[in-house]
Amino acid sequence: MRQIILASASPRRKELLKQLIGDNFLVYASSYEESPCPGMHPKELLLKHSAEKARDVAKHFNSGLVISADTSVFFNGELLGKPKSSEEAEKMLKLLSGQRFLVITGLTVLDLDSGKEISELKSTTVWMDKISNEQISAYVRTGEPLDKAGAFAVQGKGAAFVEKIEGDFFNVVGLPLFRLGKILQKAGVSIFEEGLS
């Protein structure tokens, strides 16, 4: 079994990876600090952040596969990451209310043994119901939106606002499991091997 390292402190990504391959992986959070890159297309920026997180963590290991991801909401040509305050969360939710938008994840798998790096973008379309200002305020008070891209959690109370999803549901949570499973299997990881779960 190859060593797998998840380059993320996200409890949601940890749970998703566990769902796919069981407990046989390490979690090593990246210290890479995301910064704006003027002139870079938002989608390219997600790929850059994902790859840089993987490379940062890779410096601490000699062998194995490093998995990293960066997820944001893409609406009107802009990326909506995690809100920095309750006010920003409310603003994001008002913007997305009644709209169709994309949730995009930059996914990177870095093979430390071969040096091969795979970085891809995965997109999922989300339709959000119209949300009243009262609902938005009540939801923000729960604290749930404050560490979520686009200020909502489809796997939490935010599901009450999501009318429809087209594409990989797990991508909206933060890790596109279908595509990741394919990449891991190509790298020699048997996700169906006995003893992995």
UniProtKB/Swiss-Prot annotation:
Top EC class, one word: hydrolase
EC number: 3.6.1.9
Cytoplasm found in the keyword field: yes
Signal sequence interval, chain numbering: none
Chief subcellular location: cytoplasm
InterPro entries in alphabetical order: ITPase-like_fam (IPR029001), Maf-like (IPR003697)
Active-site residues, as the UniProt record annotates them: D70 (proton acceptor)
Localization annotation: Cytoplasm
Superkingdom per UniProt: Archaea
Family: Belongs to the Maf family. YhdE subfamily.
HAMAP family: Maf (MF_00528)
NCBIfam families, A to Z: maf, PRK14365.1
Physiological role: Nucleoside triphosphate pyrophosphatase that hydrolyzes dTTP and UTP. May have a dual role in cell division arrest and in preventing the incorporation of modified nucleotides into cellular nucleic acids.
Name assigned to this protein: dTTP/UTP pyrophosphatase
